Amino acid sequence: FYFMEMNTRLQVEHPVTEMITGHDLVEWQLRVACGESLPVKQQDLAIHGHSIEARIYAENPDKGFLPAIGRLSHFAQPAAVEFIRNAAQDARAEPAAVRIDAGVRAGDAISPHYDPMIAKLIVWGASRDQALARMRAALADTHIVGLSTNVDFLSRLMVNPSFARAQLDTGLIERERAALFPAQSRVPHEVLALAVARVVADESAQAARERDDPWASRHGWRLNTQYMRT
């Protein structure tokens, strides 16, 4: 090779490796950086069960997965733990069923200046079927409001027969387009009315808290034109 790129870092999917081996690779990385040796050898490692990672992105799958920006006005996550057991300490214990690696929370903004990934959602199961079931449940408990995300797309992918059977290749999404990108249904008028009522209530509450702040006024006045809100 005239040139070879070296990525001396952990793989993006390292949580999957951690879940099926029970070892904290980030801790190992820090220890090696401090001059220590790896605590185990390759032949000492064993794989247990199955793990799946879903990367929750601020993007619009229906528009070619274009990145989205905005503020996370609501971000509810499934019940999870930060990490897993250490296999070396208790070989009989199982890894956590659900793990979330996230660097944002409700109120934070996803900007165009950085990667639009919101979180990594990782599950473990004794079998692939169990891992899939746990991922479906975890995605169903993931609720994000404020911008477009790929959560619904990932949920449809998890129930796709080809994906469930691990019949995977780079043409899967295009072949399964009809199932993965169903026609959008119209939002009921009742839902729109409730959304408008919530916005008005939130703005009224904020105006009451900031009544002495002229910059908090949002009445929409415009010079030489009629204000119309849509």
Language model: regions and residue ranges:
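Conserved metal-phosphate-binding beta-hairpin within the catalytic cores
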Residues: F1-Q11
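Catalytic cores of soluble metabolic enzymes centered on carboxylation/carboxyl-transfer
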Residues: P15-T230
